[in-house]
Amino acid sequence: MTDRDHTTVTDARGPVNTGPGDQYVIYAATNRLIRRRAESLRISRDDRLHLADRFVPPARYRIAADLLEEPGSVVLVNGRPGSGRRAAAIMLLHRFGEDRNIDEEGVRVEELPVTGKDRDAGSDEDEVPPGRGDRFLLDLSGITDEAEYGEARRRLARHRAQVQEAGAHMVVVLPWAVRHDHPPELAQHTVTLGRPRGLAVLTRYLRMDGMPFRAADLASTDLQRLCEQSAVRELVRLAGLVRDARDSGRFGDGFSAWLGQALHAVTNRADEVQRQVAAVRDTPERALFLAAALFEEMHADIVYAAWQRLMGTVRHEEEATSELGRTDFGARLKVLGIGRDADGRLRFERLAYADAVRTYFWANFPGVRDDLRDWIDTSSELRGLTTDERVDVVVRFCERSLAAGRPDHLFDLAARWADRAPGAQCDPRAVAALELGLGHERLGGWFRRRMYEYVRSSALSDGLARVLTVVCRRSLAATHPDQAVVRLRYLAVRETEASQEAKEALLELASRDRRLYRLLIDRLRPGAGRDTNRGNPHLDLLTALLGSDRAPDPPRWPDLFLGWEAVFAQPPTELWHPLAGSWLSAVADDGTPEMALEVMVGATHGRAAALHRLYVIAYGWAGPTPSASRAAVANRFWQHIDHARYARTPVTEQSGAGPRTMEEAR
């Protein structure tokens, strides 16, 4: 198994409570991720179902679907940027299983790494070979460099051979920029997809949002031109803006008004913001412009406080006159086109204007990005902000920082907030920042590598460890479960106050999936024989994992044998009692096969100390007056123990006389 870079797309996306303690549900961040699906790698089953309801097949889609039919098939899809290539590839994999009513339990639906640079530095993990029926996506569409494409082609050849041998299925999205260099030997497996009809895409999304419209409402020349020329993701954004205009209640009460506002937002906003910033020359007005864009829909007093902090962060000193002698706050807002509702909340008068303002400042004032990071650090803590509002501000900042290629700003802030969290609390701002980073299509690998480096560091604080635990459990486990296991394992064996939360999350995650269960056994076995000043956390964790309540159903005996073998190779401890007792109870009460008794005893390799302790455990488990079922199970267990002890004794082999059984010795 491997700590490799791939995306699992089988698990549902949502909050999961994996044990005792608080559950951190970041609704604002989650909702915003749902609104920005095109930028996220989180294509869980729920997300695929969402896309399937809205998907419009492009030209030649059926040809690609037919090529994917046979076990071991690899289909390469080509197409111009903006034609919806990635969405089509995801739907090919999704509908392959849907059309056949395939149960995805135990089937891998994963995104593979593009190049080796996205793997953990120094990772010694081996890639997991695919199984029959597994489905894989390899998206090479972002490659523009021929050297990088050369490496990607070598990885493609290796993946293709594995897929064919296993009878799995793979869809590859080819890069358009280097289309002249596509492998000729795969031409017969390559399909060049057309662009879906833009108007059909827009119509499908509008209908799924419950929009009341007629065909005549979509007949304008501007809209028709947009549908013919724009990338599919821009049409999806347009439909989302129509929904936002409707839901806001501020832009008319009919579809035509909502569509007009949305069209204006996607075609003219950038130029409007540029002209307005050029007209506003002084620092206070520009700072207020940006503060209102980050804190839009929040109370005016909060925006005012954030504005003042921003001017302090950029080291601007106001004029010496008192505030009563300056332009009042309301007048400044009016000049900037910012309205104040009856409840005191501030909003830009035009649809999607705040987003355009944020985009403009991050793109055109790169010298203040570090200052903006420090400003958000403290401004997101302003008194009066609700938790959802704090997270919303952080999400807006993170979106712009990621677009500007500054993932380090997100991680720096997450670490600061995590370290300042009181007691054992987990700051939701830190969780939201890291979740957004992990879900970013281009920079998600950077965050996974950074997390890997941090969990291995002895300098990791308890606060950040708690945040990383939550992020692994909530987010990374849904997209890269094997990487989540590796990181949680490092967190769980740290022997700190925060490690218990990681342990519970890790055991819960591993017990849900056979692959992950075996992966964790393999990762814990080497450390089972290494004691520390405070015991052996690897051995403790492995023993907890091997209980009957954690094992997959039905149990996979070779995996359990490897785990029990590592445990029973160490001196007996009290942890053996719940481990062995859980399996004895499972055999007696739950119909677990007796194979459990034989495999458990076999894992001792006849070690006398281990066999003796297991005998004593069974004696205590049965009790002085055992029930018939317990007495029968205990007797069969003792028989396996006696057989193991008898079989390994050299004297027995030479003389033919057996040693005393455990029962006789007792």
Region spans (language model):
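P-loop NTPase Walker A phosphate-binding motif
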Residues: 85-104, 267
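C-terminal leucine-rich, beta-strand-based interaction scaffolds used for sensing/assembly
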Residues: 271-274, 280, 295-427, 444, ...
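Extended amphipathic alpha-helical coiled-coil/heptad-repeat regions
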Residues: 386-572
